[in-house]
Amino acid sequence: MKRKAFIQQSIVSTGGLFLLKDTFAQDKGKVFGHNNITYRLDEKWGQLDTNIHPVNDCHEMVQDSRGRIVLLTNETKNNILIYSKSGRLLSYWGTEYPGAHGLTIQKNGHEDFLFITDTQLHQVYKTTNKGK
């Protein structure tokens, strides 16, 4: 009889641990994608003061050879925003691309070059990732 009571008590105690696991679990963010390709949204990544660094429309993002994320926006206060992988703003530049829409990156030698397509000005610009 003691054995039966021990087993019942063990089951009840262990079941409680599984319930507590979900109670104290932290939300890891929304998951997007399908099949075996999924992405988790990090809502704290890259949060900036929109009065200082506004983003009108994010038309393109690329990763440079140093692992930094380059974001292109048609906001002429800062057409290019460069982030670390962790979401910290490293630099920003560009005020002359009102129709910034396409962004491609190409490594030439030891340097990355950005190709920015501006659909409003009907131009394609080649720059360094410092805007020169």
Predicted regions and their residues:
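N-terminal secretory signal peptides and thylakoid transit peptides that target proteins
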Residues: 1-14
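Eukaryotic scaffold repeat domains enriched in small/polar residues
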Residues: 13-14, 19, 26-132
